[in-house]
């Protein structure tokens, strides 16, 4: 069986949860089936990572599509799509609700690989790749990995603030288009049973299975007490749920924590926009942006993890990282969605600012609350992986 996977970006280095999930999956699957991988490269400097990726995936045929070499005219459909998206996001400050458009050269590139490598199954991942189902020949089976239901993410965003009627009707259109596109696939795979049930109730007739992203469990990691007054968040500002959640936390929770303990520090790991970093470090005390780190265990050791996610869907790799490294965590109902961790026993779940702050402060001073939940969740994660 020859399997083609298309991603919306190069999965290396694994600088965010999405890339971690895709990279870890490829590392495992390369030993099981014949895999071909296609992803776009938008800037020439990204090709510097190509050799490193191929070294990590020696059994995978890797075909980068070099967007920077295939420039379209300003009047092309793809160029107009990119311009429209930039205007909507950066100038109007609104969620982008139009259907993705692909380059002619990219569509031809994918179909040529399907023909040349005699592909049997095409697996598209992430919303950016969803509508490629209409460009792929019917001679192959089509699978979609639904990491996040876009229309659910938008609906949760609309609950936080008012948007114009035009934005809301566009969101309704996107919901219908997303469901229709999913129905063109032979198989849909969600990250959680919750997302699976949502899609089934909302009219997705294609077969759906739930399977979380794979994450390797490191060896020789032991529990350490949170001796420092430090909390940590993992994720970049490019993913809107991260930016939304961290902003909410800084605006509503951080001052409550510092009021009780002014020595607390907040470390953010991941790529963040430089303007946002400058603005937030001027506005908030004891805030540190760490960027991408090679040794995650060293940075988050003895830290309390916070996952203040309010919008989006899917599974939070941040929580799985916390479990991996024995880090106690405080999260929201949306943040822990799809993971059956028990509030008060395995973590603290809080949706209100005061309750969230209280949860962080309680973990910081209660050694039993630090040790028992993380030890239990780590053991359960190992048992679950052993059963897969």
Where are these regions (language model features)?
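Donor nucleotide-sugar binding/catalytic pocket of nucleotide-sugar-dependent glycosyltransferases
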Residues: 143, 151, 168-175, 179-220
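Conserved acidic donor-binding segment of nucleotide-sugar-dependent glycosyltransferases
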Residues: 347-353, 362-367
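Acidic donor-binding loop of glycosyltransferase active sites
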Residues: 300-314, 325-327
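N-terminal subdomain of nucleotide-sugar transferases
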Residues: 1-64
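Acceptor-binding helix/loop patch of EC 2.4 sugar-transfer enzymes
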Residues: 8, 74-100, 143-176, 236
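Conserved catalytic-core segment of nucleotide-activated headgroup transferases in glycan assembly
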Residues: 210, 215-279, 289-293
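Conserved small/polar residues in nucleotide/adenosyl-binding loops
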Residues: 377-384
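Short hydrophobic beta-strand element within catalytic cores of glycosyltransferases
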Residues: 318-321, 328-332
């Amino acid at each position: 069986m020859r399997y083609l996977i298309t991603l919306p970006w190069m999965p290396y280095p694994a600088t965010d949860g999405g890339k971690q999930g895709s990279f870890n999956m490829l590392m495992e699957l390369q030993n099981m089936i014949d895999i071909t991988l296609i992803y776009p490269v938008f800037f020439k400097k990204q090709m510097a990572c190509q050799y490193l990726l191929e070294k990590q995936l020696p059994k995978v045929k890797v075909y980068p599509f070099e967007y920077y070499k295939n420039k379209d005219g300003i009047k092309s459909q793809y160029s107009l799509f990119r311009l429209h998206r930039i205007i909507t996001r950066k100038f109007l400050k609104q969620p982008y609700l139009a259907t993705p458009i692909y380059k002619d050269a990219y569509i031809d590139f994918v179909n040529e690989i399907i023909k040349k490598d005699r592909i049997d199954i095409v697996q598209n991942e992430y919303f950016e790749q969803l509508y490629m189902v209409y460009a792929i020949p019917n001679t192959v089976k089509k699978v979609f990995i639904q990491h996040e239901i876009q229309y659910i993410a938008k609906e949760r965003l609309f609950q936080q603030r008012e948007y114009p009627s035009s934005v809301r009707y566009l969101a309704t259109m996107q919901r219908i288009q997303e469901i229709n596109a999913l129905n063109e696939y032979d198989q849909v795979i969600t990250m959680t049973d919750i997302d699976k049930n949502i899609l089934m109730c909302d009219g997705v007739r294609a077969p759906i299975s739930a399977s979380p992203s794979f994450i390797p469990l490191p060896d020789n990691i032991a529990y350490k007490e949170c001796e420092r007054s430090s909390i940590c968040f993992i994720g970049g500002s490019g993913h809107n749920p991260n930016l939304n959640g961290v902003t909410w936390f800084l605006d509503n929770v951080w001052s409550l924590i510092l009021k009780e303990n002014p020595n607390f520090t907040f470390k953010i790991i991941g790529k963040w926009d430089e303007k946002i970093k400058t603005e937030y470090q001027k506005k908030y005390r004891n805030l540190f942006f760490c960027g991408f780190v090679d040794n995650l265990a060293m940075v988050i050791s003895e830290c309390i993890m916070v996952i203040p996610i309010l919008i989006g869907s899917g599974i939070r790799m941040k929580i799985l990282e916390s479990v991996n490294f024995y880090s106690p965590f405080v999260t929201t109902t949306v943040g822990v969605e799809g993971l059956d961790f028990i509030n008060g026993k395995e973590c603290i779940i809080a949706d209100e600012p005061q309750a969230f702050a209280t949860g962080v402060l309680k973990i910081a001073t209660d050694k039993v609350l630090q040790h028992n939940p993380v030890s239990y969740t780590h053991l359960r994660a190992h048992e679950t992986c052993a059963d897969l």
